[in-house]
Amino acid sequence: MKKIIILSISALFTQIAIAQKQELDSLKNIQLNQVVISGNKFAEKKKNIVQKIDVISQKEIAQMNAQNTADVLTNTGQVFVQKSQQGGGSPVIRGFEASRIQLNIDGIRMNNAIYRSGHLQNIITVDNNSIEQLEVLNGPASTIHGSDALGGVIVLKTKDPKFGKSKRLELTGANALMRYSTANQEKTGNIGIHLGTNKFASYTNITFSDFGDLVQGKNGVDSIMKLWKKPFIVARVNNTDTMLANTDPYKQVSTGYKQLDILQKFSFTPTKNIRHGVNIQYSNSSNIPRYDRLSETAAGIAKNATWYYGPQTRTLLAYQFDAFDLKGFFNDVTATLSHQFVNESRHNRGYKKAALNHRDEKINVLGYNVAFRHKDNKHELTIGTDGQLNNLKSTAFKEDIVTGLETKIDTRYPDGKNNMYLFGLFAQHTLKLDNGKVVINDGLRFNYNTLHSTLLDTSIQFQLPFSDLKQKNKSLTGNLGVAYMPSSDLRMTLNYSTGFRSPNFDDMTKVFESVSGQRLIVPNVNLKPEITQNFEAGFQYNDGKLELNAYGFYTLLKNAIVTDKFTFNGKDSAFYDGQLTAVYASQNKSKAFIYGGGISFIYRPMNHFSLSGSTNYTFGRYNSDSILIPLDHIPPVTGRLGIKYDHKKWYGEFYSIYNGKKGLIDYNPNGEDNIQYSTPSGTPSWFTVNFRAGFFVEKHTQMQLGVENILDKNYRYFASGMSAAGRNLIIAVRYNF
């Protein structure tokens, strides 16, 4: 009897061990054969791309339950995100931010000619509920993606329509979401519907979100919390601006906003190797208050009564043609024609001032890209061309809120014609040797960019000494890298790549008050393109049970565009908006460098359980008169730790996100680090403890629960003008089939 029991127990443990090994092997195979699209315009196994790519799946996005796409990136622990207002989120990749990284949606470049060098919120115009896969390509990627890809590229792939099995139109899939969060009284609803036949398919996705004012944490250092509380609000009382006490100083009044996102895609396959697609996207928001500007005071008196972004509108209409498994030299072809329209505006009024300033920017972007791929056992060759034409209309006026009188004021960008054209030819090659153990990536790109702006009224335009601005730039960029995989467990990489960024309207032509009454940025027509050289090494180990990744990089930046002191009409200061203000401008500095590295791991001690962690470090300086000065946008040490159970029926995770201290000595003195919103010693280090879980109540319906910042810590991300959320309870219901 004892032998039978012992044999039974032994057999049971053997089966468990076999099952565990099979699951771990399955996970390993999935990771090894993971497909990405950011590397060369076509679907490619991640292991064949030398450059570091972080991939976030649709399942991971759903489990995160993030309120927007910027928060998805924050939750990974791999990407730092800055916020000046709740309706924002500006990713930083390897010390580059805003116009120095590229956003790409469904193969279409989102960056336009007014992507600024400071902080952006454009990524939140992409609904994370519509994303199928998100990829972060780390380091210069100009060979394939062109200008602006200095720090990297964020590739957003939206969900494709699902085809049916017959000629009859049928429901082929659906998704829905309802979510409530307590820290900002978030109310989000989402619905998506797939309809299809065997040749035609449609996908419609609609999301609406209502975000209230964000409440910050109540636990922290008293002296810091005093700085970051909002003790007042500004209201009109008897037609006069009045400072009133904020009844809840932890509530960051004037941070709430609303947003609507719509995605509509059609797909048609007349034959098995031809596909036509139409992609329609629309995103719009309510007014988005600039909380950082509304919290500013001078001698205890509010500086601004009103400061908000108007509704941020983004539309995209694109046609895509794909042909695959073709006979002849080229096996695959993809081509896209697109039109994008973006409307942004800024509205501000000083405290107890009657003049409400309105500045509006409308930009239309026509674009195309065409790529051809050849594949054989050893070689893959992708060649192609892409281009964009940007047309900008910038207008401005001042409204007297008492009399209603409207008068012209200086526009943010030139008030005449503004055109920017980007053109590129590229080739990317992959060579596989020794049965795929050695993979070589090499590529080359030719860039040609032009910019032309005219000023119609130079008297209103801040009395600028010129009326016509022109620039033409050419460049060659490339990459060369090798991946060596001596076994299925081990992978080592070396990579060299160059990046290129041509100055846009925001760099060359804007008039902008960066810090109220302290710093005025004026145009500089003598800017040159920024050029980077990047050296990178990587190490990956994955035996199914332990996955370990480490990397290091060194980037040389030539002609780095930084904000520094300047003279305008021979003077170092000028009157702007009624105040004598120091003059600054974007300028090329001869040299800059950024280096850093990171390590991440996932350890799976048994089926369904995993321990994970990551940490990243970045350091950057530029040379000014033989003095090394900190570059702006360089985040502190960042990272994440987590323990997770993930079963097909339910999952649960405890995790912590942390940031190191950013001391004042490491702040850029003139750039976009927002030193005025930090503490006397800089940005303190912090960590949060968080929990999330989900379980299926039936096959297609999932309940989700989360508690973020369980300890209710009061903290702020580096360079951010508002504090992060305090303790936040999240309740959600999802439906998918």
Residue ranges and their predicted role:
Residues 184-210, 221-287, 313-315, 432-434, ...:
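Transmembrane beta-barrel wall of Gram-negative outer-membrane proteins
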Residues 21, 253-259, 269-330, 341-363, ...:
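Flexible loop and strand-edge segments within Gram-negative outer membrane beta-barrel domains
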Residues 286, 341-345, 398-405, 448-461, ...:
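Surface-exposed extracellular loop regions of Gram-negative outer-membrane beta-barrel proteins
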Residues 110-140:
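Short acidic/polar hinge/loop motifs at secondary-structure boundaries
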Residues 381-491, 512-515, 626:
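Signature of Gram-negative outer-membrane beta-barrel scaffolds
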Residues 434-435, 449, 553-556, 576-667, ...:
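Gram-negative outer-membrane beta-barrel transporters
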Residues 21-62, 98:
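Short, acidic, small-residue-rich periplasmic hinge/interaction motif at the N-terminus
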Residues 365-371, 422-424, 522-528, 534, ...:
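Outer membrane beta-barrel strand-and-loop segments of large Gram-negative receptors
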